Amino acid sequence: MMRARVPLLLLGILFLASLSASFAISLREHNESQDNPFYFSSDNSWQTLFKNQYGHIRVLQSFDQHSERLQNLEDYRLVEFMSKPETLLLPQQADAEFLLVVRSGSALLALVKPGGTIIYSLKQQDTLKIPAGTIFFLINPQNNEDLRIIKLAMTVNNPQIQDFFLSSTEAQQSYLYGFRKDILDASFNSPIEEINRLLFAEEGRQEGVIVNIGSDLIQELSRHAKSSSRKSLDHNSLDISNEWGNLTDIVYNSLDVLLTYVEIKEGGLFVPHYNSKAIVILVVEEGVAKVELVGPKREKESLELETYRADVSEGDVFVIPAAYPVAIKAISNVNFTSFGINANNNYRILLTGKGGPTGKEDNIISAGINPDVLGLMFPGSGEDVQKLFNNQNLSHFVNGSYHKNAQPQPHEQEQQKQQKGRKGAFVY
């Protein structure tokens, strides 16, 4: 997925040529999070759908309501689930496909299908797809560790996603209760009084959709659980790894989603890159990082570029549109999970560093563009530009402190002055 096509290379170079060291001062900068259409703060972007002493369910603000620039994500939502030890999320189904990742802890996930119930044993970094309309329930089998899960929800009924619970609790009503008496007694072949007593009576009703359960039930379900058919983002399946970071990719072709897990060491840099087709939803798990994204100015008639910056930490979300160059620098050890929408036939294009996972291949810029063309694109000679692009010996993750504490040299200051007022990408 890392091999680029020439038009994509040229697009990336147009963006790259608009950057000077530290991104040229001609670019309008967005350092304030409230002015950044791609940034979702953990403090005020999550809405709590349900909460009790056993856990909570939260949903991220809808992308299209957050910014008109995220309209393409109107059919997607992020859901966070947390439960205490020895608890059960009651059976439900939804009018959406789910792609879940276990952020911490372990889980038993039961999928109730026409051919029978399948119970999966999931551990940290395991992922699984829940098909739309499938009845499922979720258990935290541990006795001393919370379970945390992040889910990408993909609706099949616009515009909202609806969870349907079989049973009534103090928090919500069973959807069975919506049917008329004559439909219920005929369907169950039982008097309505018995149906009301067994299914709808307030006595014995659970307080909420997350409930405490006993160890006997956990042991019984665990005996029938299997770990096959699930995929993992753990260290045993790394695609990219060096001293500064690790990366794992999993593509769910049926969902057209690229699932990625990234770890960056403190001081490390995920070099400037972009995705040719995928819109990436980045969810920070742990640590702190600085994200810099370069894209068109918001005014449609403008040809200038903007730099969107954000300091992200646990629970924050950042959206990276397709073809927008981005760089991520770790302030502390940081890790995050990302969901790439439109993953099929997507390429991750590195703008600097070596292009291959082993670091032995030439980077795609110098390998894909003739030195004579490079000489026409940049002020330096084609050979010198090619050498510059080949200076970095690592792929994806590098030491991010090479220019730390360095002051701009006179020629750098002059270059910044010359860049001021220039236009950026073509917008049409």
Curated annotation (Swiss-Prot):
Glycans are attached at N31, N246, N335, N393, N399. Residues 38-196, 231-386 form the Cupin type-1 domain. The keyword Signal applies. One of its GO terms (molecular function) is nutrient reservoir activity. Residues 1-24 form the signal peptide. Keywords: Glycoprotein, Seed storage protein, Signal, Storage protein, Vacuole. One of its GO terms (cellular component) is vacuole. Residues 419-428 have a biased composition (Basic residues). It is found in: Vacuole, Aleurone grain; Vacuole. Residues 399-428 are annotated as: Disordered. Major seed storage protein. Homotrimer. Belongs to the 7S seed storage protein family. This is Phaseolin. The gene is PHA.
